Amino acid sequence: MDWKTSEMLFPFPVYMAPLTSKFAAYKKKIANWLTVYRIFIALPTIIFIALDNQLGVLANFSVGAISISLQISLLIGGFLFLTAVISDYLDGYLARKWLAVSNFGKLWDPIADKVIINGVLIALAINGYFHFSLLIVFIVRDLVLDGMRIYAYEKKVVIAANWLGKWKTIMQMVGIVFSCFVWSFKQSEIASLNSGLFFWLLTQLPYYLAAVFSIWSFIVYNIQIYQQLKAYNSKL
């Protein structure tokens, strides 16, 4: 059977070809739109969380004998941040699965992550939801490390992200999500059910673990940058 006969008997792949090519063109756009989504919701997410104490908007209801009061502003901010986390995962997963990594994604994906994560962390720390000293560790680490990466890049030295930095980000995300959803019950009788060690583990431990990974990854990155810059200078 020649290819013409095969095409006449089984025309399905031929008819599907235009659809396949169109879908291939949209692959990069889908991942990029997920990045754009995070950029656009960063500001409203930060505002809802930052104005939690000022707005004080509550939703009151009862479940049996338990009276529940929800901080709506914090809850909305937490929900928006959770959608950002999901979009970040889908963005990376689809880009790898479809081999659809774009220059736009390389530039704006890490920027979107840093803006929304650091912005929300600042808002939470100012409102007293975790210790301000941990925020200083996170911000100083990112600023110094980004400056060193830029300097190394000018010397044609590229330092790839490692698992320590990824776990730092994961712990920050976990801490933010738990803070928003758990602290939204702070004026409720149900908050007493979550008090003590369990309450601390949910709302504080992730930040301390993130601080450990921040310092650890900072040291590792410094060693890698120093070694590669030393190798680069030795070739001059």
UniProtKB/Swiss-Prot annotation:
Name the source's superkingdom: Bacteria
Recorded topology in the membrane:
Multi-pass membrane protein
InterPro entries named in the record: CDP-alcohol_PTase-I, CDP-OH_P_trans, CDP-OH_PTrfase_TM_dom, CDP_ALCOHOL_P_TRANSF_CS, Phosphatidylglycerol_P_synth
Question: What is this enzyme's catalytic activity, as reactions?
Answer: a CDP-1,2-diacyl-sn-glycerol + sn-glycerol 3-phosphate = a 1,2-diacyl-sn-glycero-3-phospho-(1'-sn-glycero-3'-phosphate) + CMP + H(+)
Q: Does the keyword tRNA processing apply?
A: no
Q: What keywords sit in the KW lines?
A: Cell membrane, Lipid biosynthesis, Lipid metabolism, Membrane, Phospholipid biosynthesis, Phospholipid metabolism, Transferase, Transmembrane, Transmembrane helix
- GO terms for biological process? glycerophospholipid biosynthetic process; phosphatidylglycerol biosynthetic process
What are the EC numbers? 2.7.8.5
Give the location in the cell. Cell membrane
Gene Ontology CC annotation, any one: plasma membrane
Q: From the UniProt record, give the pathway where this protein acts.
A: Phospholipid metabolism; phosphatidylglycerol biosynthesis; phosphatidylglycerol from CDP-diacylglycerol: step 1/2
N-terminal signal peptide: none
> Transmembrane stretches, by residue range?
39-59, 66-86, 120-140, 163-183, 196-216
Please provide, alphabetically and separated by semicolons, the GO molecular function terms listed in this UniProt record.
CDP-diacylglycerol-glycerol-3-phosphate 3-phosphatidyltransferase activity
The family classification in the record reads: Belongs to the CDP-alcohol phosphatidyltransferase class-I family.
What task does this protein carry out?
A: This protein catalyzes the committed step to the synthesis of the acidic phospholipids.
Q: What is this protein called?
A: CDP-diacylglycerol--glycerol-3-phosphate 3-phosphatidyltransferase
Gene encoding this chain? pgsA
